[in-house]
Amino acid sequence: MVNWAAVVDAFYVELFTAHPQYQDRFAFKGVALGDLKGNAAYQTQASKTVDYITAALAGSADAAGLASRHVGRNVGAPEFTHAKACLAKACAANGAPDLGGAVDAIISHF
């Protein structure tokens, strides 16, 4: 069984290591990567990410809605393309299935 919380934690560390400027778009901006798990705002975001992954795996994810919510935050296809690469690394490192198709579904709505 995949530990999706571990996958999500690895994803965000990978994302913010590769693209540190992206962390500034979150309520936990400025929190050291090693301290993310103890930050309430990060925990909320990580939980939402796990929920989305769970929905994507069940075939009930709202890719259009997620894309729409991110447009208002000035986040689009380029950022999700970067996220896709980081998520692939996190999935591979944690024995999880590739979620590239779920990210592509989001990207298709930008």
Swiss-Prot record:
Residues 2-110 form the Globin domain. Coiled coil: none annotated. Transmembrane segments: none annotated. The keyword Kinase does not apply. Keywords: Heme, Iron, Metal-binding, Oxygen transport, Transport. Pfam families: Globin (PF00042). Heme binds at residue 70. CDD domains: Mb-like. It comes from the Eukaryota. Gene3D superfamilies: Globins (1.10.490.10). GO terms for molecular function: heme binding; metal ion binding; oxygen binding; oxygen carrier activity. Homotetramer. Belongs to the globin family. This is Body wall hemoglobin. It comes from Cerebratulus lacteus (Milky ribbon worm). The lineage of its organism: Eukaryota, Metazoa, Spiralia, Lophotrochozoa, Nemertea.
